[in-house]
């Protein structure tokens, strides 16, 4: 389930602090992010919630680390409860399942599209793929709501939360009313990265599947 969600989100979401004005509208803070944050690294926690509101039930929790350099380069690594790697070098997306010792390759252009990954790893042209508007403020977090313009995406609504100028969380809601919630800590924006930081090497003996 976790892998399906992240693959559908095209390697999913790597997040980071944004030093936007603390009281700016969420749309302004997002724009500061896409124009000012070219790379980042940090840690994430991901929760799967079945249902919404008070009736929502957490069905799974995972965590790990991320690093990215826009456009199209990122590493999203799960470390708990088990090890899985999603990595893109700007052209190809690699998904490595350590337990199966299996690598899946996908063309990156087709993977991003109207997914949440396009917000974080793609270009700055958000309005091409999303309807963007300010949402409510909850517990001090200002939310931005993005609705994909494409009709064939897995997520029908994407929420991005900011607090005191920093990216705090993302909510991905599917057509069945289930939510994937990501929260971010230890974020560093625009850190120095090695030239080969996103070069993927197939592990010894791994099976490779191309899609």
Curated annotation (Swiss-Prot):
Is NAD found in the keyword set? Answer: no
Cellular compartments annotated:
Periplasm
List the GO terms this entry assigns under cellular component, sorted alphabetically: outer membrane-bounded periplasmic space
Pfam families recorded for this chain?
Answer: LolA
- From which residue to which does the signal peptide run? 1-24
Q: What is its main location?
A: periplasm
Per the record, the coiled-coil ranges are: none
Keyword terms of this UniProt record? Chaperone, Periplasm, Protein transport, Signal, Transport
GO BP term (any one):
lipoprotein localization to outer membrane
Q: What does this protein do?
A: Participates in the translocation of lipoproteins from the inner membrane to the outer membrane. Only forms a complex with a lipoprotein if the residue after the N-terminal Cys is not an aspartate (The Asp acts as a targeting signal to indicate that the lipoprotein should stay in the inner membrane).
Q: What NCBIfam families does the record tag this protein with?
A: lolA, PRK00031.1-3
Q: Which family does it belong to?
A: Belongs to the LolA family.
The molecule here is called: Outer-membrane lipoprotein carrier protein
Q: Which organism is it from?
A: Cupriavidus necator (strain ATCC 17699 / DSM 428 / KCTC 22496 / NCIMB 10442 / H16 / Stanier 337)
Gene behind this protein? lolA
């Amino acid at each position: 389930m976790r892998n399906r969600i992240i693959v559908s989100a095209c390697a999913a979401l790597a997040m980071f602090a944004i030093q936007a004005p603390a009281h700016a509208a969420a749309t302004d803070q997002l724009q500061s992010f896409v124009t000012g944050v070219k790379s980042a690294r940090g840690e994430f926690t991901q929760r799967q919630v079945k249902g919404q509101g008070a009736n929502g039930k957490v069905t799974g929790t995972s965590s790990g680390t991320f690093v990215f350099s826009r456009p199209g380069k990122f590493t999203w690594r799960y470390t708990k409860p088990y090890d899985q790697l999603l990595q893109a070098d700007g052209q190809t997306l690699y998904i490595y399942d350590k337990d199966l010792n299996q690598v899946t390759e996908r063309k990156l252009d087709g993977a991003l599209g109207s997914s949440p990954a396009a917000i974080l790893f793609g270009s700055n042209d958000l309005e091409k793929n999303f309807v963007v508007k300010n949402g409510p403020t909850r517990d001090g977090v200002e939310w931005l709501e993005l609705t994909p313009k494409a009709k064939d995406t897995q997520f029908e609504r994407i929420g991005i939360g900011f607090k005191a100028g920093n990216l705090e969380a993302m909510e991905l809601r599917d057509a069945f009313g289930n939510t994937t919630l990501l929260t971010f800590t230890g974020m560093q924006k625009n850190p120095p990265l090695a030239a080969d930081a996103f070069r993927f090497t197939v592990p010894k003996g791994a099976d490779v599947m191309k899609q």
